[in-house]
From Swiss-Prot:
The record marks 86, 88, 90, 187, 223, 226 as: Interaction with FhuB. Residues 37-296 form the Fe/B12 periplasmic-binding domain. Changing residue 68 to L: Decreases binding of coprogen. Does not bind aerobactin and ferrichrome. Increases resistance to albomycin. This is Iron(3+)-hydroxamate-binding protein FhuD. The keyword Chloroplast does not apply. One of its GO terms (biological process) is iron ion import across plasma membrane. It comes from Escherichia coli (strain K12). Transmembrane segments: none annotated. Its main location: periplasm. GO terms for cellular component: ATP-binding cassette (ABC) transporter complex, substrate-binding subunit-containing; outer membrane-bounded periplasmic space. Belongs to the bacterial solute-binding protein 8 family. The keyword Flavoprotein does not apply. Residues 1-30 form the signal peptide. It is found in: Periplasm.
Length: 296
């Protein structure tokens, strides 16, 4: 990331949900937690709450949530509590949440947050299988809130949905798929074998075109010219209200010369949160189906 321009680094850091630590805090029990007053300081626990049928009382950085995540949508009633890295502690104190949830290792220290309300961090990944960790985190949150049946129902629906969509991709063959999102007109984020999407690709027999380096979260930033090496691939690029940058890139001779562009195998698709959990994975499958489902 150090090689990116400052504006690119800022844009990428805005998108990333860093959660490398395993430290967790659990100082409240379900009986003491009002489910109508739970604040989520990061977008992973937002998704976990929504999967359990709980609308957060407050969420950090709702504007960027709607750009980068979009699904599941946030109701207008949700209060924006500031940045994910620096939430508004004064506002949080005034809101008197019954509980706060965040991504472990991201944002203010748990000790600082404990002065406002009890809370706990949840993990996005173990660096290898994000969806397996997502299911584990969902179960942990359900245990905390005494919503085990809701978690079981959601996970069963998730498995049924993933399985039901598999026939949509059986005719596709072995052409690899490159998953990307634009950071700026010169750099893209690409997603590798330890990303949220890999388990879905494996289930559907779709090879991941990116087998290069990745970070803990399953992604890496690359210069646009590195994509010229990819020839017989499909390429999907997740939008996030970045049409100006996309238009600038697509007007360049370098981009127009890309083999997958000339072959008509590049598509811009709706935003999917690549550091999410099961709801993001289901949204990804719907986006994937609209783009390449039922096609050879």
């Amino acid at each position: 990331m150090s090689g990116l321009p400052l504006i690119s680094r800022r844009r990428l850091l805005t998108a990333m949900a860093l959660s490398p630590l395993l430290w967790q805090m659990n100082t409240a029990h379900a009986a003491a937690i009002d489910p109508n007053r739970i604040v989520a300081l990061e977008w992973l626990p937002v998704e976990l709450l929504l999967a359990l049928g709980i609308v957060p009382y407050g969420v950090a950085d709702t504007i960027n949530y709607r750009l980068w995540v979009s699904e599941p949508p946030l109701p207008d009633s949700v209060i924006d509590v500031g940045l994910r890295t620096e939430p508004n502690l004064e506002l949080l104190t005034e809101m008197k949440p019954s509980f706060m949830v965040w991504s472990a290792g991201y944002g203010p220290s748990p000790e600082m947050l404990a002065r406002i309300a009890p809370g706990r961090g949840f993990n996005f990944s173990d660096g290898k299988q994000p969806l397996a960790m997502a299911r584990k985190s969902l179960t942990e949150m359900a245990d905390l809130l005494n919503l085990q049946s809701a978690a079981e129902t959601h996970l069963a629906q998730y498995e049924d949905f993933i399985r039901s969509m598999k026939p949509r991709f059986v005719k596709r063959g072995a052409r690899p798929l490159l998953l990307t999102t634009l950071i700026d007109p010169r750099h893209m984020l690409v997603f590798g074998p330890n990303s949220l999407f890999q388990e879905i690709l494996d289930e559907y027999g779709i090879p991941n075109a990116w087998q290069g380096e990745t970070n803990f979260w399953g992604s890496t930033a690359v210069s646009i010219d590195r994509l010229a090496a990819y020839k017989d691939v499909d390429v999907l690029c997740f939008d996030h209200d970045n049409s100006k940058d996309m238009d600038a890139l697509m007007a360049t001779p370098l981009w127009q010369a890309m083999p997958f562009v000339r072959a008509g195998r590049f598509q811009r698709v709706p935003a999917v949160w690549f550091y999410g959990a099961t709801l993001s994975a289901m949204h990804f499958v719907r986006v994937l189906d609209n783009a390449i489902g039922g096609k050879a």
